[in-house]
Amino acid sequence: VSEEEASRIKRGFENSFLLPYPKKEAVVTISLKDVYHKVNASLTHEIIPNDILIHQRGTNHITPHRYLLQNGNAADCIDVAIMAEGYTEKEMDIFYKDAQTACDALFSHEPFKKLKEKFNIVAVASPSEDSGVSIPGQGKWKSTAVSSHFNTFYSDRYLTTSRVKSIHNWLAGIPYEHIIILANTDTYG
């Protein structure tokens, strides 16, 4: 971490690892390596498929979504999810229009243009309570799907979210390998 803030503040960040749900007990080990491939830290976790504390998602209550581009099944294509952030239920038609604009813009450039037939793009209508995104530097806090905000690392236009679990919960049951969070703001961030 090269930001100045990292020299004075220690912080933890959510992370998610997507893997097939095991049919029988499995052991998963995650290792963090340095630039010399030396393991600095590792975590081992046993997964017991019938554990009552595992919340299986993606079978019920799947977030409403619409394919903007569908060139094949999920196994054969690169699946990109475009998530709504800062769009209320009433603004979902605007979100779908904005998502189509983003999709069209992506495929107007190489190498995406020549590889368009290898992609599926799905717009995911993750509703927010408030319209727009938070701007802490102006004292504006919004209740949104994944709690995104400007002023990350105290930079005015640095827009991000730390709610990685929320992102994946909204996308549960929808095929994706890559995620674009489309924020309802006119500010470039």
Task: Tell me what each language-model feature is.
Residues V28-I30, V80, I180:
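Hydrophobic beta-strand residues in large extracellular and virion-surface proteins
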Residues Q56-S108, K113, A123-I135, K165-S166, ...:
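Fold-level signature of zinc-dependent metallopeptidase catalytic domains
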Residues K118-G189:
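Active-site-proximal segments of metallohydrolase catalytic domains
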Residues V1-H55:
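Beta-strand-enriched, solvent-exposed domains that form extended recognition/catalytic surfaces
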Residues R8-K10, L19-Y21, N71-N73, F112, ...:
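Sterically constrained small-residue positions within well-ordered secondary structures
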Residues I48-R57, G86-T88, S143-R157:
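Acidic/glycine-enriched edge-of-secondary-structure segments
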Residues Y36-N40, E89, D186-G189:
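Short, surface-exposed beta-strand/loop "edge" segments at domain boundaries and coil↔beta transitions
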Residues F13, K24-A26, D76, E117, ...:
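Residues at beta-strand starts and edge strands
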